[in-house]
Amino acid sequence: MKGKAVHFTNDNGDKLSGILELPVERKPAHFAIFAHCFTCSKDLRAARNITLALSQKGFGVLRFDFTGLGESEGDFEDTNFTSNLNDIAAAAAFLEENYTSPSLLVGHSLGGTAVLMAGSQMESVKAIAAIGAPCE
């Protein structure tokens, strides 16, 4: 697994920080986005482990910090669920502009709920995995 630090801008102009993990010995067959849990970061052990497993299966995976968390700009106190959805859309736009649109969204806890909602608006998404997501 080789991680590459990347940055992209959300619709509020905040620079979001991410890590793009690519398979070691081949080009990615597909791309995925990993959305972390509430107040966590892209560096959460679960995020790293899931990213590793997906990259070993041929996925390029972008894990990023939501606005105001980790290394991303912005004030966390000014964020809400809608801003999380917008951050996921910004991550997808980054992949589309630089690689190809994501076909898989993965989220943990609140990130899982966010990918369920965001993925329903993205034509490129073929699968969504929500881990411990609070959603009815």
What are these regions (language model features)?
Residues F38-T51, F66:
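The serine-hydrolase catalytic nucleophile loop
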Residues M1-K27:
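N-terminal cap/lid segment of alpha/beta-hydrolase-fold proteins
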Residues P28-C37:
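Short beta-strand element of the alpha/beta-hydrolase
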Residues L69-T100:
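Catalytic nucleophile-loop/oxyanion-hole region of alpha/beta-hydrolase
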Residues A91-E136:
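Primarily recognizes the serine-hydrolase "nucleophile elbow" in alpha/beta-hydrolase
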Residues T51-E73:
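Conserved alpha/beta-hydrolase
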